[in-house]
């Protein structure tokens, strides 16, 4: 018979890194008595959430999808970014059967190949090198008409940094002698993930019907006109370039984002016959629509890189051992604490319950830096008091989502709100004898301005993230921990042996070590 759940709570403070620099550091500037007290009195240290330590290229900043995959898997997960880059380097990409089938069908009928994707070197949702490779693939397979519909970043990159990326793609098309950038739009519209269909509709109508609010002779001119309207990359309004292009019946469309969460909505508009979230002017009958990776199992389109399966991730292993678990987050990070933390699995494991708290409906989260954290905390405190679960896994979105706004004062408020929430959870746990681990998936809010450009720093960082144990046991934190070590640490606290698939090792060790 299992004992009464104590619970063990894993708090993931999204985008909450540690920087030795105090410049533009919202974590340093915030009044955070609870976290300060825990760091002074509890076993704690820093762990890595970027680069090779999470299965990304060396020096690449971490992100929420990658972070949660590693946290939940208990092993370093080879990321889609790295898989695609390697396939391009090895030449396998240019023979990819799924992409080639769609491109060849369009080419044989004398039709166009449309490339969609985030044009950026941010490496979080996409990489411009992948877009270049796709243009080269289309050219090599005989496409006469190659159109890039570029989504601009300014979020995982500096707010006004798209010019160099546009120049690079213009140069690529010039070298190939075929193809061009057909449209520009900010990711705010094309890559929504919060069912703001009015935004997605603007991107869809731009791509499919060549309907933009603005037109420019070249992509460079289109970008400069947007800057003159005081739009940073993320918010560039729908702009057609040159003679407006439409997606015609028989064309092929390849979506080159490798990260799923912000590619799903636009993809659904293209491929779902019964799509009803807004009135489509038309749905082209395509030679093929290819997702670079599987954006969701329910989307009726093939993917170029099929998902790898992860066995015995934390959620699965807890279920097999008869443990109950709660996953809870607000809308912005719900997919991360469920789908990504479960290794790319949509449905809950046996004994797993989920609570989704709606994110506030504001244009940008600097307008409401507390987001829905207080409501999330209410639910967790209630669950702890009633001892309903063995394990509670929560994501707090504030550090990341407010960090992305680039507004320092709001970021400080976000950190201060988090401190209050952590305090409430720790107090509730003390009353029932529970334990907690506090960590993050990657950095962001600890660097709010870019010293080299003087612009707001809206992107993630490569900084390490905190790791704090909250409980009564005499344990110490070892050096060199990574996100993949968090699940094995939780199993140690729960008294469960680690499955063979988990190659991570506990960050908490006995003081004798």
Curated annotation (Swiss-Prot):
Q: Cofactor comment in the record? A: Binds 2 manganese ions per subunit.
Q: Which GO terms describe its biological process?
A: glucose catabolic process; glycolytic process
Q: Which residues bind substrate?
A: 125, 155-156, 187, 193, 259-262, 333
Q: What is its EC number?
A: 5.4.2.12
Q: Which residues cross the membrane?
A: none
The UniProt keywords, alphabetically, are: Glycolysis, Isomerase, Manganese, Metal-binding
> Which Pfam families is this protein grouped with?
iPGM_N, Metalloenzyme
Which co-factor is required? Mn(2+)
Subunit composition? Monomer.
Q: What does this protein do?
A: Catalyzes the interconversion of 2-phosphoglycerate and 3-phosphoglycerate.
- Identify this protein by name: 2,3-bisphosphoglycerate-independent phosphoglycerate mutase
Q: What is the lineage of its organism?
A: Bacteria, Pseudomonadati, Pseudomonadota, Gammaproteobacteria, Pseudomonadales
